[in-house]
């Protein structure tokens, strides 16, 4: 399991729109707890998630379905 890309660079204060596509055979979830955003995506489906990074720093994201994060489904949003 993985997110591609696993590192996303953004500018502080800029509205970001992520378009997600689940190309796997199992449901997945994108959880960005720092932004209060989470989305479950069924196999073959797409979803859009929007957020604004309020300050510079690294923000973690991951799939919260049990076992997926430890299997490598995680990443970082780098805001500058």
Residue ranges and their predicted role:
Residues 2, 43-80:
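Extracellular/periplasmic metallocenter environments
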Residues 5-8, 36-41, 49-50:
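Beta-strand-rich interaction surfaces with strong enrichment in secreted/lumenal proteins
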Residues 16, 26-28:
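Short beta-strand/loop motifs in extracellular/secreted proteins, especially
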Residues 20-22:
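Asparagine-centered strand-capping/turn motif at beta-strand->loop junctions
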């Amino acid at each position: 399991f993985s997110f591609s890309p696993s590192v996303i660079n953004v500018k502080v204060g800029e509205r970001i729109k992520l378009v997600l596509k689940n190309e796997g055979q199992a449901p997945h979830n994108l959880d960005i707890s720092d932004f209060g955003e989470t989305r479950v995506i069924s196999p073959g489906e797409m979803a859009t998630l929007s957020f604004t990074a309020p300050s510079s720093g690294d923000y973690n994201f991951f799939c919260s379905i049990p076992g997926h994060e430890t299997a490598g489904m995680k990443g970082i949003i780098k805001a500058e």
